[in-house]
Design a protein with these regions (language model features):
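Short acidic/glycine-rich loops and adjacent helix/strand connectors
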Residues: 1-106
Length: 106
């Protein structure tokens, strides 16, 4: 069985979603991008964009954890999983907005 990353690497065109949450901690940016080519011939075309704001509570907790004050490993683990869920929701919203099936994302 061929490794899934090798299969992805060999595709001429890949459909991906990039996620980011910056230092303002105001929400998640998600971009749907088609990547074609390889090496110096690589090209990226943005097909869609979505911003999903964090709730005031989530933003406050992110800033508290980033502030260097007292926090437990459990606090960071909870935030890690919550951010994963919020990034996933942003990706799902972006796919719905652009009419892209989740199964089409590489």
């Amino acid at each position: 069985m061929e490794h899934p990353l090798k299969t992805l690497w060999e595709k001429q065109s890949r459909l991906v979603i990039g996620f980011m949450s910056g230092t303002s901690a105001d929400g998640v940016d998600a971009a749907l991008v088609r990547i074609t080519g390889f090496g110096t011939q690589t090209r990226a075309e943005q097909l869609g964009f979505r911003f999903v704001p964090f709730s005031d509570e989530v933003r406050a907790e992110i800033l508290r954890l980033a502030g260097g004050g007292p926090a437990s490993a459990a606090d960071f683990c909870r935030m890690n999983f919550l951010l994963g869920e919020l990034f996933c929701e942003a990706g799902e919203a972006l796919c719905a907005q652009t009419g892209t099936k989740l199964s089409d994302i590489d």
